[in-house]
Amino acid sequence: MIKIENLKKQYGNNVVLKDISLNVKKGEAISVIGPSGSGKSTFLRCINGLEELSGGHICVDEFDLADKNLNIDKFREKVGMVFQNFNLFPHLTVLQNIILAPVTLKKVTKLEAIKLGKELLEKVGLLDKADVYPSSLSGGQKQRVAIARALAMKPEALLFDEPTSALDPEMVGEVLKVMKDLAKEGMTMIVVTHEMGFAREVCDRVIFMADGEIVEQGKPEEVFLNPQNERTQNFLKVLWKR
């Protein structure tokens, strides 16, 4: 479903992503782990078209990000993204945040969008918050709204950029539950995360990135219990000691 070939990204002389290739099957859930500064977030932003590629191809079904004639809005309908800091519009209510993109980009009628928005809020357990503003929500609630907003475009894949790292520990579980439910439903997901329990329990594959490269990948039990690369081994040793 997502095919990445020889992806490169650099800013001036700073090479952030080095010749990355990856195939993601429909319905596959992948966790991307690795130290800070390894290029994980830039990798996701490239997949979503938020960063211009310095080289290579990212194809989602028939769309190729390297195509100069690509309709980027149509591309982003296929691939949604959930950010670390929620990125909700503070001047809009929860429901208005969710229906904005379907109404403006997909030309869905407002009535249809409201119906869908309420269904999604019920899905993430926040229907009672439809008419409040983001400022009155907890961090966990904001992130669940952000997930509902991404789902409102009916994407075929979702990208999560450290969705729980800005949350208080007691709020992490409510967001992970929504993500686990999405994985069970067969949503294609690529998740940059430090939540190793989620990666082990929910994901089909774990990718370890370092220095802008995919250093190792495999099933969760392979990567976590028997890592082959020394950099993966050292990263996990530090992690388990915390």
Task: Give the location of each predicted region.
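C-terminal boundary and immediately downstream tail of ABC-type ATPase nucleotide-binding domains
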Residues: 210, 217, 221-242
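ABC family nucleotide-binding domain
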Residues: 1-220
